[in-house]
């Protein structure tokens, strides 16, 4: 609905902004912060790829390492020797610590670097060691950072073979989250949760966070410090924006694409990375997200006076109920399927009374739930297909 409204109102009066506009502002100094623990063979390649492909000159990369992780330090040292704008930061405490603790050490090193170089960064960007950064990302941040305090771009996981079901669930989730949920959240509530990667903070925002935490910007007790920061900045009246900005010219419009893949969506300035591919790793990561957002978030961020923002807070926190209910529903479904198989395979089997017969209200409720489920499936297929093509869209079912 929002897209249709903008197409009928905004884009009829104003042409879509071209990516060439991003080249007009002077390049402001930007700092990229990358925490790294046990990232041997990864962080060096990431920093080198960024240093050689970013379409921007006035930036520095600060990689946070640990004193008890010499292999990662060695990787970073090799890149630092080749690129003077890549810097190694060694945290005060041995690892592993929380991501927030590492980022606080990196931010402290950036402050010292600013004093010694006698200049100030205009923006501070979060990335992980696995990220592939879009060449135009810094130009987009440079264009917006004077007017916005938190800028978030989409995250689109890399594809794997279709048999990698665990990893592929991230494709489904992020396609919907950053294609639908967060844009609507920003439009209605003006609040954008940071994804922890592809996030740029203005100098105003970082200064406010440092003042709020007595010199410590990121909450080291939080398992989801990125989610936490979005609310802290909103409470301070800072402006937050989620940006879906495509880099499309006439040549790219004519390029051969996957079936039903959208030209503008598939050429979005975004963050690409591989997500966990094993069940145990994915459970550990998603458990951290659930605990941080649902339980720690409920304790830290109270309900507000805004009904709209409270609605999105409820959507964040309903996982405390829905995750358990979904698990119980799955057990019930397995039980019903086993009973159905038992009654079908053995003619003389005991036939249990069905819970689905004799109630018009129950049947109506089941059909209503079925309709809602189909609606959710269709939405997921649409948003996955827009970036990845129809094959991935159908696999999301």
Residue ranges with predicted function:
Residues 295-305, 309-312, 319, 343:
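Pan-eukaryotic secretory-pathway lumenal catalytic ectodomains of glycan-active enzymes
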């Amino acid at each position: 609905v929002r897209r249709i409204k903008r197409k009928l109102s905004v884009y009829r009066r104003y042409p879509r902004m071209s990516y060439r506009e991003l080249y007009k502002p002077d390049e402001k100094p930007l700092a990229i912060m990358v925490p790294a623990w046990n990232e041997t063979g990864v962080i060096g390649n990431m920093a080198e790829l960024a240093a050689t492909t970013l379409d921007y000159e006035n930036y520095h990369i600060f990689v946070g390492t640990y004193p008890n992780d010499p292999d990662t330090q060695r990787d970073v040292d090799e890149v630092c020797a080749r690129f003077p704008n890549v810097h190694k930061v060694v945290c005060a405490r041995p690892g592993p610590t929380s991501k927030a603790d590492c980022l606080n050490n990196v931010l402290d090193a950036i402050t010292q670097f600013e004093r010694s170089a006698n200049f100030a960064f205009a923006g501070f960007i979060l990335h992980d060691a696995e990220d592939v950064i879009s060449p135009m990302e810094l130009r987009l941040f440079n264009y917006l950072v004077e007017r916005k305090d938190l800028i978030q771009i989409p995250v689109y996981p890399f594809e794997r073979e279709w048999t990698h079901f665990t990893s592929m669930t991230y494709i489904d989730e992020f396609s919907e989250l950053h294609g639908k949920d967060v844009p609507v959240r920003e439009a209605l509530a003006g609040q954008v949760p940071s994804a922890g990667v592809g996030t740029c903070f203005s100098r105003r925002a970082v200064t406010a966070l440092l003042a709020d935490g007595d010199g410590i910007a990121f909450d080291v007790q939080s398992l989801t410090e990125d989610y936490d920061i979005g609310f802290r900045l909103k409470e301070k009246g800072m402006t937050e924006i989620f940006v879906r900005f495509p880099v499309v010219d006439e040549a790219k419009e004519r390029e051969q694409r996957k079936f039903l893949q959208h030209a503008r969506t598939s050429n979005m300035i975004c963050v690409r990375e591989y997500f966990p591919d094993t069940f145990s790793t994915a459970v550990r990561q998603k458990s951290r997200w659930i605990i941080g957002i649902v339980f720690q978030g409920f304790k830290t961020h109270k309900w507000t006076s805004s009904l709209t923002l409270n609605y999105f807070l409820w959507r964040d926190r309903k996982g405390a109920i829905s995750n358990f209910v979904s698990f119980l529903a799955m057990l019930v479904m397995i039980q019903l399927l086993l009973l159905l198989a038992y009654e079908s395979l053995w003619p003389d089997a005991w036939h249990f009374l069905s819970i689905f017969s004799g109630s018009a209200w129950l049947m109506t409720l089941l059909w209503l739930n079925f309709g809602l489920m189909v609606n959710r499936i269709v939405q997921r297929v649409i948003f996955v297909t827009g970036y990845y093509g129809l094959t991935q869209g159908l696999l999301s079912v």
